[in-house]
Amino acid sequence: EITTRLVGSEMCIRDSFNPLIGLINTGLSNGLTAISDAGYITVLGLILGAMMAIDMGGPINKAAYVFGTGVLATASQMIEKGAQPGDPAVQACYIAMAAIMVGGMVPPIGIALACQFFPKKFTKEERGSKVSNFVMGASFITEGAIPFAAADPLHVIPCTLIGAGVAGFLSALFKCTLMAPHGGIFVFATVGHPLLYILAWAVGSVITAVLLGLIKKDVK
């Protein structure tokens, strides 16, 4: 009976918040669309990259990802109607998706690098997860950074946000494109300007790691 009540309470709370989250996501999506329509593709890349690192799997992260899958669908529809893959409007869709993925790959990699080069900033348990974070980051699984963000949000989240934002900005600046909705390094063969894309990913990850090394306090 207690379990039933708890489950019922959880469902009520979740249902109460779902409309609010839906409104927020709709607002974010509309704002991102407006930026894209205005032609500010590098600004869009920066925002999308940063959104992937704010809550790492939460509503803001998911809003950015859903926007990305939505523009991929839009690109497919435009091509079906006669547009060419190289048309600017189609390319803008692929550029947005590339910025989203690189932004989501930065937090785990940046944290793993920080664990490697600034070990005094992390507990033994945290340092032990660096290999899994390398794997998760390379696979575009941002959630590997969540335990670190939960343990020290005031220091970790700003670092991952800045690094991911820079990566998204550079990816868009380099006009890197991605036609796949997921896959990490396993879909790099489909990325437009792959070497520049790797550079954007590396720069964002290093920025995250260095910032963590500078502002995170030593573990006692």
Each predicted region: which residue ranges?
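A generic hydrophobic-helix recognition signal that picks specific residues
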Residues: E1, L48, N133-M136
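Single conserved hydrophobic/aromatic residue that forms the stacking wall/gate
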Residues: E1-G8, C12-I13
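C-terminal TM-helix exit segments that contain a strictly Trp-centered aromatic cap at the helix terminus
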Residues: E10, R14-F17, L170-S171
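Alpha-helical transmembrane segments and their helix-entry boundary regions
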Residues: M11, P59, A63, V156-T160
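Generic multipass alpha-helical transmembrane bundles of integral membrane proteins
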Residues: D15-V131
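Transmembrane alpha-helical segments and their short flanking loops
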Residues: V66, Q77-Q91, F118, F122-G128, ...
